[in-house]
Amino acid sequence: MPASPAAQLPAASLLQLIWLASPALPVGGFSYSEGLETAVERAGVTTEVLAGDWLRDQLHLSLARGDLAVIAQAIPAWRVGDVQRIRELNDWVLQTRETSEMRAQAEQMGRSLLDWLRNHDGANAQHITACAQMQPTYPVAFALAASQTAAGVRDCLLAYAFGWAENAMQAALKSVPLGQSAGQRMLARLASDIPTAVEAAISLPDDERQAFSPMLAILSSQHETQYSRLFRS
């Protein structure tokens, strides 16, 4: 049944979220595999099924309990101008990046998105200045961009998670390697799981937000000295 007009996301906000989730956004997300490249080499992630399982675990065990939860809390904080709350969330992201590659990714993508926002019509200059002063991470910068739309938190998280899934799928295609049809099947699996991950993230209070993924940290550390690699993480 079609949604009522009152329940529909305004077209402008929908397009803004699609834009933010697009792999074409110049933030460099395509250049990171987030440990998957090393998992292919060292942990036997060598098939479509295994790669899909790996990404699904990343979605539920890492993204939903960490970055998505941060964004869910940061969007309303940006909308009311609670810079201290934003700073606390940004510090948490920095503190939970367990390797140099993970931290470099969060910082580089955050800076790039903030640079994009500076040249974006309708950007809040005061918020951009506040964000720039705190060594912004990507989740916090994304929350700033999303907060300037009329979209609800849930829709913003769905966009972020799908953008992550597209980049992760592309990393799997290049690392394993796999074909385009396999990639679309993997993306379909992730898309069906994203709403559940988003609901879990929205429900998390501060003391239950976490980023404990020891094997991922080990693989990320190993990636720093991996002899042959395509990705920056």
Swiss-Prot record:
Keywords: Chaperone, Cytoplasm, Nickel insertion. Belongs to the UreF family. One of its GO terms (cellular component) is cytoplasm. This is Urease accessory protein UreF. It comes from the Bacteria. It comes from Polaromonas sp. (strain JS666 / ATCC BAA-500). Required for maturation of urease via the functional incorporation of the urease nickel metallocenter. UreD, UreF and UreG form a complex that acts as a GTP-hydrolysis-dependent molecular chaperone, activating the urease apoprotein by helping to assemble the nickel containing metallocenter of UreC. The UreE protein probably delivers the nickel. GO terms for molecular function: nickel cation binding. InterPro entries: UreF, UreF_sf. It is found in: Cytoplasm.
